[in-house]
Amino acid sequence: MDVKAASLVDAWNERVRRNPEGRALAYFDGSISAAELDQLSDAFAAALEARGITYGDRIGIQLQNIPQYVIAFLALWKLGAIAVLMNPMYKERELRHLIEDSGARGILADDSLYPATAAAAAGTAVEWILTTSGLEYQRRNDPRIFHSAVPAPSSPDGDMAAWIAEFAGRKPADRTLAHSDVALLAYTSGTTGAPKGAMNTHGNILNVAATCSAWMGLQPGDSVLAVAPLFHITGAVIDAATPLLADTTLVMVNRTDPAVVVDAFAEHQITCTTGSITVFNAIYQVPDAAAAHFASARTLYSGGAPIPPSTVHAFKERFGAYIHNIFGMTETTSAVIGVPPGVQAPVDPASGSLSIGLPLPNVTARIIDAAGNALPFGEQGELELSGPQIVPGYWNNPDATARTMPGGRLRTGDVATMDESGWVYIVDRMKDQINVSGYKVWPREVEDVLYEHPAVYEAAVVGMPDAYRGESVVAYVSLKSGHTATEEELIAFTKERLAAYKYPRSVYVIDDLPKTQTGKIRRRELRKTPKEG
């Protein structure tokens, strides 16, 4: 893969030229060659162009891991348009913020999501909502994934397959793109908890894809399984863009059912994948999973949530496959620190934590003090990162960009140490952000929902260690005088208003929340052993 390619489109065109008949996508029993994928994305790009979509326009994608996601990526990039990653689990209030902030002109959504997506888009700049079905591009209809073999009704605005069929054999106008052009808007959270759109450029993605391809030793004929969701930066870049541009096969299974993932490893002879520790924990619990399923696995990476050494050991003992740590952020276009393939990460003797790895090529990592000065090896400070993977900023948010990326160097907000060999260890987070299975949850957002309940007087949300998810969301509330509310009632209330990974798994009703003399809630005390008041 040539990182010097002018854009992702140029890199993709080179891959098609090298091996047009090579398998680019596998989806259950379906297969799409590079040439076929190129034609499908050409037709979709031409359809979008005919409807006025052009350079710089934003289009939301609200899908699971299905071939249409990749078709849309390539089509939008061919137009110089920007893909806005939208989580299919988002509820109306969450989705509406992404729509309004990005100024999306259109949305490609799963057909089952149309009613909720239409409600979120009402009164915004969205001109149309196009739908598609995960049943397409395969015939197996695995009942573990598909509960019905009949697609949901299409959007009144149209169906993706129909748009592609209408423009079959057509191409969009040629467009010259550069490394600095934005390819993705991937939303993260800022210090206030408000989601911000990180502007992942063609150059950012090319650099990460080229680095990861070389780092993982990807070869033509390898198969990479996308277990990380493509609406997450890791899924979009490492699990999708990297194999697509590296002349390997991207294997997709819609959503992560652990038994389906295990079967896919054997069926498609998976060599590499990157997912959260939750996925690997779930795989470990599959009764029939055996070492034979993972015989082809050469490189397994886990990112998002911390990975305990005991989990790595147990997986290696049972399946013969070692899980490597990898570290990245939306602002770093995914991976920037990782454990080299075939190398076992050291464990910090002081904390017992597994190293997240070494800085990848072209990445500069420093541990700094509050003034931005580099600290000696072994001292704790904030992890700062720089390199061609760092995004140029946040969409329409120069103030947050200046705070988080002064001089183009990313202040991660993570407390870390680095040893003399360059191994990095995460000690703690400077922020209150909660990591649930690799998904980021901000306490304030959950607290705001709790405050909508008529009985809640005060609320505080913290992350608690969870062997399965990495961390779980836990809430503490005090109630208004004369009001009552149960844990079950409050959980149900938040579950209706937040994505599945965001709502609290436990809610403790206590008399008073612990506070400082200035009235700030002492979250550290709440992270101790929970006690009901």
Predicted regions and their residues:
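Conserved AMP-binding/adenylation subdomain of ANL enzymes
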Residues: 206-223, 231-272, 280, 286
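Conserved ATP/PPi-binding loop(s) of AMP-dependent carboxylate-activating enzymes
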Residues: 358-362, 371-403, 441
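Gly/Ser/Thr-rich phosphate-binding loop
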Residues: 270-274, 284-350, 364, 374
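ANL superfamily adenylate-forming
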Residues: 116-179
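AMP-binding/adenylate-forming catalytic core of the ANL superfamily
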Residues: 90, 107-109, 387, 392-393, ...
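Conserved pre-ATP/AMP-binding loop-to-beta segment of ANL
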Residues: 21, 151-187, 194, 217-223, ...
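Conserved AMP-binding A3 loop
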Residues: 33-35, 174-175, 183-207
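Conserved AMP-binding/adenylate-forming core of the ANL superfamily
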Residues: 4, 21-66, 70-74, 91-96, ...
